[in-house]
Every structure is written in structure tokens, then in C-alpha cells.
Amino acid sequence: REEKFLAKGLSNIKSTLEEGVSRRIFTTERVTEILGKISPTTDLSRLVNCQLIIEAVFEDLNVKNGLFRHISSIVPEDTILASNTSSFSISELARAVSHPERFLGLHFFFHAAKNRLVEIVKGDKTSEQVFDNMMQFMQRIGKDPIVCKDAHGFVVNRFFVPWLNEAVRIYEEGIADIAAIETAACRTFGCSMGPFALMNATGIPIAYHAQKTLYEVYGAFYKPADKLLQQMNSKSPWEIKPEQIIDWDVYLQVSERLSAVTMLVCGQILDKNICTAGDITRGAGIGLKWRKTPVNIFNRLGQDRVIELVQPLLQKWDMTIPRKMDTNSWIPDYISVEKQDNVGVLTFNRPEGLNAINPMVIDQLEKG
């Protein structure tokens, strides 16, 4: 059975590369070269000479722990080990790793071969050298890394998965049908795929289990929608009808609900210093391909309107408003300043906008 999985994996890789040839991203020779560097195997002992090993098995804590214990017993103590988990604590997983200072989280995004975003997550015992090496390595292979604290859901999934779940709740409550929710979501966040299309593409079980993990850690607000569980159990995709003309009142309800949930969760992220507002923008812009990120929406609506939008959620789920729902906390860090001897170095960090200059960048340049 394992050999079939290897064959399927290689076939998927080959299809992606051939698509790259058709789009003139790769030459046929380059594809042959890449495929020649891939050595599929079910024999873990062949990992003994690897310098970096990234685990990407399904989200089962016992399976991951067992795998890391096995790998730790095979490879040298300086081999860097990483998990692609999107649900579990890196510090918890590190308990299964000998020499946990060499362990960290490297969370890639769908489609990993095309998506530039990667979340880099330090565990309690991750060494600075391992962290720095992985930052440099990710940049060298063309990724745009964001750094986040070790918290369930990290950055992007912490707000993206509740966005999916809230879309199902809206459908469940009869406020709008799936087609209308898709239309409103795409217009509000500037994305090409709405929540239901994305769940169909990446797997409804993945959305459900990710939301369930958040619920178990963070409480009632994160409870998976009943229809999400039902749809997963049906083993069928969501039925999405063609885009339709949407009633304006319905559009506003859907848009405001999805915006409120997203900004509330991002406020919680900022409260815990899991990342910066700039990292949220980079995560949404690069990882999710949202042209209108939560930070963009917050700054467009303004602090008072955002607080007004999240009030119904706070009342319904008996929550307090995050402390960092103020304008200053939602300014993305586009410019970093560093002094090297007598030279000042300004670094642009706005890859989601191709490092283009906008009024906020100009303001930060002047202050820098």
C-alpha cells in the first residue's frame, strides 16, 4: 500500500512540474533534473545522511510523536528536524525528539510548490542557530517566512479556519446560501476562491479537525459548526452554484460577519504577541492570496467601526474585547531599521505588495 502512495506522490509532483513547463516556468531539462533529485522510499534508515527532515504526515499527535522518536534514533544529533503541523504545539512535539534544540515548526501553505509563505515557529528549546539557519534557508529557496510564537493555529490558520467555520455558520443560520456567501467573501477579502470552494479544494476534514483543535484549546467561540461536521461525515464536497447577483442587505450581513470574526481573532493574536500586524498582512496576502487583508480592512473601517462590528460576537460568546483593537496596534511593520557600524540599513518587508511604496511605507521611511 505504501508503494502506491509513493507512486501517487511522484505523479502529483510530475504533474505540477509539467504545468510549470506549459507556463514556461521550467524547461523540460530542468524538470528532468528536479525529478532526478527525488528519491522516494518507505525505508526511514535512508534518512541517516539528511541535514534537514520535514515531517508532513496527517494531523495525529500519536503518529507524529512515534515518527519523531523513530527518526531521532536514526539520524545524527545535529540533523535539523521540523514539523509541517498546522495544529499542534511545537514544544509539545519536541518532547518526542532527542536533542530538541534542533527542532522547530516549518508550516508551508497550499500549494507548497507555488505558495511562497512559510510560518517559522520556535519551540521552547529551539536554538537560535537552528532558527537562523532555517530563516536563511527558507529565503534562499524563494520563500517569504513569517515568524510566530508557538500557539495553536500559529498565525494564518488561527484566523483563516474560523473564517471558514463562520461561513458555514452563516449558511447554517439561513442568512445566505452558499453561492451568496462565496460572492460576498470574495468581494470583501479580494480573493478568487470563497470559503466553501477552498474547503472543497483542501479537504473538508482538514477544516473540521483544525477548527476542532482550536475549539479544544481556545473555547466555545471556536466550536465547529454542526453543518461542517455533517458535511465531513457525508464525504461529499459542498455544492456550489454559479455566482449570482446578491441582495445588498444579505451581502452586508455576510461581509460584516466574516470581517468581524477575522478581526476579532487577529486582535486575540496581537494580544498574545504571537506575531506583528505586518505578519498578519503578509500571511493573508501571500499565503491566502487575499488582496484585502484583515489589517487592510481594519484600517479602512477604522477602530470605532471595527469595535462596533465585533460587539455581537463578544456578547454571544461571552468574550472580552482584545486590548489591541486600537489603530496603533494594527500598523504593519513594513520597514525595519538596523545599524551596522556607522551605516544605517533600512529593509523593506512588504512582499505581499511586491515591496511597492504606499503612503504607510513613506510614513515609516520618514520615521526610520
Whereabouts are the PLM-identified features?
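N-terminal glycine-rich phosphate-binding loop for ADP-containing cofactors
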Residues: 1-342, 349-352
